[in-house]
Amino acid sequence: MGALPDARGSGAARALLDDFVVRAGAQGLPEVELECFAQNARALKFYQGRGFAAVRELRGWNQPADASRRASAREPAPEPRVVDRDAAFEWLADVERRIADLPLQVTPSSLAAAVRPLTCWRLGSAQIVFSVVDGTPTQVHSLVDTDPAQRDAQVLLRRLRAVHAADEIVIPALQRDDLGGDAARREGFAPQVLHQVLMVRALEKP
């Protein structure tokens, strides 16, 4: 959500957010969530004032193209299993049922609307969903490893670097450290300057 400079202080943002919360409650949803850049103190204060609490940090990661070329010289990583879109979404939906606070954008509800063509790999306890479009960075849409050690996620990232060695690889600021972010750090990805927090507000039952 954003507000034009002229609308600041008018109460429009507060009214929109409150309407969103009321509509969600009327549909029987237990909570609502949003993401906010951690460095945006004004927005954080606004959301906290409307009952939202930060529950998770969400980081973004980059791997420049030149670093990817160097990575391609490493020993080849194990071959992941390519899974079709339906199977990948079913796996993610199961994870979403078992693990709380998974950002909406990395789940099937949002991925189903992706315009870029999605490729899905799975290895052990981890799955990665990414897209490759000529002339643009390789984009990771979802990376989840249900094993705290995140070894399989690290192997998937290493394999992605090797296969798309000439491309920049971008993981948007939606990545939880405990579900794949630590693997990105170990694999040499650089953290983006700005990161987000996942904020949640519980709703009262009607």
Question: Where would I find each of the regions flagged by the language model?
Answer:
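Structural motif
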Residues: 143-148, 171-176, 202
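Conserved active-site alpha-helix within GNAT-family acetyltransferase domains
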Residues: 10, 14-18, 26, 38-56, ...
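Catalytic cores of nucleotide-enabled group-transfer and carboxylate-activating enzymes in metabolic
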Residues: 62, 193, 197-203
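Conserved acetyl-CoA binding element of GNAT-fold acetyltransferases
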Residues: 1-5, 35, 133-153
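Conserved beta-strand-loop-alpha-helix junction that forms the acyl-donor binding cleft
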Residues: 4-5, 34-43, 62-66, 171-181
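Conserved GNAT acetyl-CoA-binding A-motif
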Residues: 24-35, 164-175
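Amide-forming acyltransferase catalytic core, primarily the GNAT-like/NAT-type
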Residues: 49-136
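Conserved acetyl-CoA-binding loop-helix of GNAT-fold acetyltransferases
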Residues: 3, 9-22, 45-49, 148-162
